[in-house]
Amino acid sequence: MDGNGRWANAHNKSRSYGHRAGSENVINIVEACCEINIKYLTLYAFSTENWKRPEEEKKALFQLLKEFYKKEIKRLISNNILVKHIGDITAFPKDTIKTIEETEKETLEKCKNPILTVILALNYGFRDELKNAIKNICYDVKDNKIDIENIDENFIKNYLYTKDTPDPDLIIRTSGESRLSNFLMYQASYSELYFTDILWPDFSKDNFKKAIDEYSNRNRRYGGL
């Protein structure tokens, strides 16, 4: 979800205004996923690098997170949409953490066979995820819970935040940037990439479906012929 700040600048608005516009666009893309039967949607909402942002901007982002969860919870449940997060949210404000955890618990209890799982990447960065995975593997080796010889790529996946979700088939980045920026680097090994100059608040359902259509026409060989 990239380009909120630049969108705000283009409209002579504050960065917080841009983030709000970006937040409001999330539901449009969620609806698009439901319309074309996509089962998982991961949104990069707050990266480990976002702590470098100005204090007021971070406060606005945390407030928007709370508002999003509280405002959309009924709609998500009524449409049988499960909400989860990946990343370490322990450094977030306590009231934000409480809202996130309560919403996730409620959707888990009420959405038994979800048509879509929405995953918000919050205080997420792959380098941080990898660090934590390596530490936890080392702890388990030290405690004789695992044998080093049994460690393979499938084993490593069980120590990642995304252990319960499939690897992404397609990664879409808005705003004209052509890099992954520390996002799901292990999981994206064979993901298709789609880059667009459109800023996130302007990224419509039609734009999303166009990206999916282009992806559908690609020949994924996974290193083979």
Regions found by a protein language model. Name each.
Residues 1-225:
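Flexible, compositionally biased loop and terminal segments
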